[in-house]
């Protein structure tokens, strides 16, 4: 349920 490249610790 998260877009590719999504990280809860790094949002770019």
Swiss-Prot record:
GO terms for cellular component: extracellular region. Expressed by the venom gland. It is found in: Secreted. Keywords: Bradykinin receptor impairing toxin, G-protein coupled receptor impairing toxin, Hypotensive agent, Secreted, Toxin, Vasoactive, Vasodilator. One of its GO terms (molecular function) is toxin activity. One of its GO terms (biological process) is vasodilation. Bradykinins are a potent but short-lived agent of arteriolar dilation and increased capillary permeability. May target bradykinin receptors (BDKRB). May cause hypotension. Belongs to the bradykinin-related peptide family. This is Vespakinin-X. It comes from Vespa xanthoptera.
